[in-house]
A protein has these predicted regions:
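Conserved AAA+ ATPase small/helical "lid" subdomain
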Residues: 1-7
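Soluble catalytic regions of large protease machineries
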Residues: 16-30, 36-194
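Non-transmembrane, extramembrane segments of multi-pass ion/lipid transporters
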Residues: 8-14
Length: 194
């Protein structure tokens, strides 16, 4: 099967030998589904693959359908929103904080550092000329801006998922049934939810 070969060779995703608790697997599936749903809502056709399979001890993942780079601030913030969507999805469906989302939070934090330098002016103001470092006051100010923007984008992801809950649940169901969904599967699911 070509999909199986793609998963193993390109993405290095193996069928897991260990049994994952069914409740935990449902949360993993909604987490991954949330990334895919937000990506598809913001940029239809942009998600290439979403899976609950694992790689190096990490279960679940998602990849864009093609190499896409943010061309502007809006696209960049869409990427951060998609990154935060897994956590928002678990909160929406299960009413609990997704404590497994630390890698996503770290990624969102890194993306926000880039956003501040390139789009928010954080890289151009507050520099102390003597040692070419930011002042403590400026660092604190930048962290406050970043934190507020992350909260805003998390709420944006939550709202997108709330407005597309049937799509989210259908993708979760598809992941629980098939482990992996491709771009074409997501398109069919989305069409059935409209």
């Amino acid at each position: 099967d070509i999909t199986e070969a793609l998963l193993q060779v390109v993405y290095k995703l193996q069928k897991t030998d260990t049994e994952t608790d069914s409740t935990e697997l449902q949360k993993i599936a909604v987490h991954e589904a949330a990334h895919a749903v937000v990506g598809e809502v913001l940029h239809p056709g942009s998600i290439g693959i979403v899976t609950v399979r694992g790689n190096q001890g990490v279960i679940g993942g998602m990849a864009n359908g093609c190499a896409t780079y943010a061309q502007n601030e809006e696209e960049f913030l869409d990427e951060v929103t998609k990154t935060l969507a897994g956590r928002a999805g678990v909160s929406l469906i299960y009413g609990v904080m997704d404590i497994q989302a630390s890698a996503d939070i770290e990624q969102a934090d890194k993306l926000m550092d880039i956003w501040q330098c390139h789009f928010a002016g954080g890289g151009f103001v507050g520099i102390e000329s003597g040692d070419n470092r930011m002042s403590e006051q400026r660092l604190s100010y930048n962290e406050a801006i970043k934190s507020a923007k992350l909260e805003e984008l998390y709420r944006r992801a939550y709202k997108i998922l709330h407005n597309n809950k049937y799509f989210l649940l259908a993708v979760q169901h598809g992941l629980l049934e098939h482990e992996t969904l491709l771009n074409s599967d997501l398109a069919k699911i989305r069409e059935s939810c409209i």
